[in-house]
């Protein structure tokens, strides 16, 4: 009973005025929670370090997953519309929530936003999760397939693989 009362994912019935789960655009108030999600992955080299100033400046690119006021997932998109492409980055779901389809939800949301912006392709750079993206319809590409601006920023020392998905 105590686990149900004192945790965010207890089992039981709760009557609430608003919904407990929410997928929504990030705000400046969310920056601290986003940093908590991304910092461990920056520390182990999975993600490129961004820092608070970058996340604050680019917060409108982020979407967050929230449960009962706790942010447990995020994704970022960066449009390169002159080349009809959108980059998806920082797709993160807190470990306790993994395996529940939340990553898929964030991916579908990023795809939908990219299509709304007029993009025909979504791309990611990854050093560790190739299998996840391949399973979801991404094809391996090369640096030369990236938008010119992104090619100029590409850090070859990270050896990130490029994966691209054609949006339908």
Q: Positions of the model-derived regions?
A:
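Conserved catalytic-core motifs of GNAT/GCN5-like acyltransferases
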Residues: 123-125, 134, 139-162
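Conserved beta-strand in the GNAT
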Residues: 64, 70-79, 85-92
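C-terminal catalytic "cap/lid" subdomain
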Residues: 1-49, 53-54, 97
């Amino acid at each position: 009973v105590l686990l149900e009362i004192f945790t965010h994912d207890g089992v039981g019935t709760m009557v609430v005025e608003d919904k407990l789960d929410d997928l929504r655009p990030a705000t400046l108030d969310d920056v601290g929670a986003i940093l908590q999600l991304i910092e461990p992955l920056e520390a182990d080299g999975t993600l490129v370090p961004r820092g608070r100033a970058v996340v604050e400046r680019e917060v409108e690119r982020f979407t967050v997953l929230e449960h009962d006021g706790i942010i447990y997932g995020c994704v970022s998109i960066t449009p390169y519309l002159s080349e009809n492409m959108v980059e998806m980055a920082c797709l993160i779901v807190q470990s306790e929530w993994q395996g529940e389809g939340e990553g898929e939800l964030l991916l579908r949301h990023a795809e939908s936003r990219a299509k709304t912006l007029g993009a025909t392709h979504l791309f990611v750079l990854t050093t560790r999760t190739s299998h996840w993206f391949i399973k979801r319809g991404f094809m391996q590409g090369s640096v030369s397939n990236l938008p010119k601006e992104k090619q100029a920023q590409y850090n070859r020392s990270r050896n990130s693989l490029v994966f691209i998905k054609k949006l339908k």
